[in-house]
Amino acid sequence: MEAGQLEKANRLIHETRVMTLAVCRNDIPWSSPVYFVFHDNGFYFFSNENSRHIKDAEGLNSVSASIFQDSDRMDLIFGFQMAGRIETISKMDVYLKVVKKYVSKFSFLKQIFGSQMIENRQFFLEKFKSRLYCFHPDRIYLSDNSNPSGKRSEIDITVIR
């Protein structure tokens, strides 16, 4: 990945707030937007365990996700198209690290609910009926309409920080 693309990819992951997850069960596709944070090569999000995208992802080896910057110019469309799997997060150390990042990225939550979001492990479950999940990408394609030599290329997630 070129240096300019790497910088744009880093900004995209850390500044974009919404990732769209897509699943398919019994030939019925479904997509859902979720707030996310990037940590340790994974995309973490909170969701209700009974939501359609979580229920439909159970037992699937592959789901898809995308993250794109918003633009009103076609030549500035830039983002990721991904395939991977969803995992429920239960390890306390991972949970605490991710919640701190989540609260930092979505600071309005801490302003509304205070420090209990970090201190109370059950906060998201009690308040929003949501659990922590991680989308682990197996394949990531960078889509960059500003690149004249090729609009789409597979990338290694480990280069993103």
PLM regions: where:
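Short, surface-exposed beta-strand-loop junctions and turns on beta-sheet-rich folds
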Residues: 51-53, 72, 148-150
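Charged, gly/pro-rich active-site loop segments
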Residues: 78-161
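Extreme N-terminal tail/first-helix region
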Residues: 1-18, 161
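Short Pro/Gly-enriched beta-strand edge/turn motifs at strand-loop
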Residues: 14-20, 114-117
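Short solvent-exposed loop/turn micro-motifs enriched in small/polar/acidic residues
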Residues: 14, 28-29, 125-128
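Short, surface-exposed beta-edge/turn micro-motifs
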Residues: 33, 41-42, 60, 129-130, ...
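Short beta-strand segments
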Residues: 16-50, 55, 63-69, 77-81
